[in-house]
């Protein structure tokens, strides 16, 4: 299935000179991984508390900007690990765990908006965790780590960024709170349905590859 993840090689080529510079400065893959997680969690808390007491503002657009920067962080830590011989068992743990922590925080912060259904957002977090676990499980049966779409990590970053943009621009279009609820929860439901398909694809392709 198509996924934004397939654009990763081209993205890495753009970042390669920057990665070489980081290596010369003594920056390690694990440093980048942990820093990205800390910024993600800090931003999630900031959005959650900031928008509890006021309506949407331009500040919400920090979210899609960070999601793009975070994709660069994820590419950089992987390139440092692979191309500069920094791969380690600790790095493998940090890569998976920090991503899951960051994803969960960055999705849950949308609970602060009253028009978003909490139960639906919690379900998305669960399905996102399950999809990553389905990918991580593949090596246990002799297959490669699976990154199949259509709702991988990069895809979720895009759709949640779109959610943030919708939340920002909607008040300029309409003041119908019921409609914004339908739009945002409909988008979240769409993400959930594609997450279920992603889980299925990762399990199916892991088993088929192993056979």
Name the predicted role of every residue range:
Residues 79-119:
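Basic, amphipathic juxtamembrane/active-site segments
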């Amino acid at each position: 299935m198509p996924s934004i993840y397939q654009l990763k090689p081209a993205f890495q080529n753009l970042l390669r000179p920057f990665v070489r510079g980081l290596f010369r400065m003594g920056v390690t893959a694990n440093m980048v991984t942990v820093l990205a997680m800390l910024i993600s969690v800090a931003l999630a808390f900031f959005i959650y508390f900031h928008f509890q007491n006021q309506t949407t503002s331009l500040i919400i657009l920090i979210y899609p900007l960070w999601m793009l920067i975070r994709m660069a962080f994820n590419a950089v830590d992987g390139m440092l690990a692979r191309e500069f011989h920094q791969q380690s068992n600790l790095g493998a743990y940090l890569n998976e765990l920090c991503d899951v922590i960051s994803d969960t925080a960055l999705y849950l912060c949308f609970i602060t908006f009253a028009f978003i259904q909490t139960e639906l957002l919690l379900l998305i977090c669960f399905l996102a965790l399950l999809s990553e676990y389905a990918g991580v499980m593949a090596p246990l049966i002799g297959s490669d780590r699976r990154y199949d779409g259509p709702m991988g990590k990069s895809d979720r970053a895009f759709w949640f960024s779109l959610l943030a943009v919708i939340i920002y621009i909607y008040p300029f279009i309409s003041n119908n709170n019921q409609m914004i609820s339908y739009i945002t929860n409909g988008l979240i439901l769409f993400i959930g349905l594609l997450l279920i398909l992603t889980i299925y694809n990762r399990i199916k392709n892991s088993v088929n590859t192993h056979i």
